[in-house]
Amino acid sequence: MNKRITRPTWAEIDLSCLQFNFNQVKEILGSNVKIMSVVKADAYGHGVIPVAKTLVEAGTQRLAVAIPEEGVELREAGLSVPIQVLGEVLPSQYELLFKYDLIPTVGREETALSLNRLAAKYNVVKKVHIKVDTGMGRIGVRPREAVGFVKKVNSLSNIKIEGLMTHFASADERDKSYTYEQWDKFKQVLDGLNKLRIDIPIKHSSNSAAIIDFKKFGLDMVRPGIMLYGLKPSRDLINNIDLKPVLTWKTRIVYLKEVPPGTGISYGTTYVTNRKSKIATLPVGYADGYPRILSNQGQVLVRGRKAPIRGRVCMDQIMIDVTEIPDVRVGDEVVLIGEQGTQKISATDIAEKADTINYEIVCGISQRVPREYKNKIGG
């Protein structure tokens, strides 16, 4: 059954926009830098399998996920490109790395030793990427310990260090000084390894913000994430880049009524009409990922005009005021994220009102919102 028919709330995913954004990354970096496209968290809420297949067809050399289980999903869908697991992996997950040919990110000696034993058991050499924590404070070996750590891991007979990586904490901030500090620490590690003649084929550090603002940090490979989906990491980037949002979120009016002045709207009657008003109900709510914090402050698009949310966002429904919009009818299309006529509401607009980031908005659109895919490569 077509989910789109059964529910008048859906997200449209334009895969031609995804390909456009991927090509923008290639244009910035040139042909000598590999691209590992980040598709964790269900491709940032866009649907991982169609997105991953599109990116592979567009030319990405690798894919990155956060947890092994996401890599398993890609393998079971037939994706054969190298897949790296960016997060720390616990012993209970090690078998998945071998069974599904996933590349772990290693920052602990215990992990390296355990993987080496398992690789010997299976009579294979396991590729790994070493994570250096230059200032994120998350996972990874600290810079002053990194050269010795790499030397030790490099001596393991069933481990092949394919990559060395770090992650920038503040590349999307206006003040770039901390990013330069991180870069200097990473370069010192690379220089130390060069002195020992330890060759690591793939060095990588750049996330979306660094790709846009720090081209020289590209090294051998980059890890674009949010920019692939047409969203900028922040408004504080120095360089401009043309990106096309991949996701549009839509719903339809399911109920329409006129109410007199003094009518309370939604839970807690936090909004009370001060005039005769036309109130429309939408079949979408915070269970679908629309932020409840936008109660009485969010807007949607109806017939090319902005309509304010009235009252609290409910779990499954939202009420909007369409008094000023003529000819509104039940069944009219409503845009939550995207464009309608000359008006636009972006994920970033919603994020700013919700005091969060655009990443959280698109990742938070729940699975009960059907995704419709448009403009697939090759049809």
Swiss-Prot record:
Domain of life: Bacteria
Catalytic activity, reaction form: L-alanine = D-alanine
Annotated catalytic residues: K40, Y267
Pathway(s) annotated for this protein in UniProt: Amino-acid biosynthesis; D-alanine biosynthesis; D-alanine from L-alanine: step 1/1
Residues that coordinate or bind substrate: R138, M315
Principal EC category: isomerase
Record-level GO cellular component terms: cytosol
Purpose: Catalyzes the interconversion of L-alanine and D-alanine. May also act on other amino acids.
Protein name per UniProt: Alanine racemase
Source organism per UniProt: Halothermothrix orenii (strain H 168 / OCM 544 / DSM 9562)
Gene designation per UniProt: alr
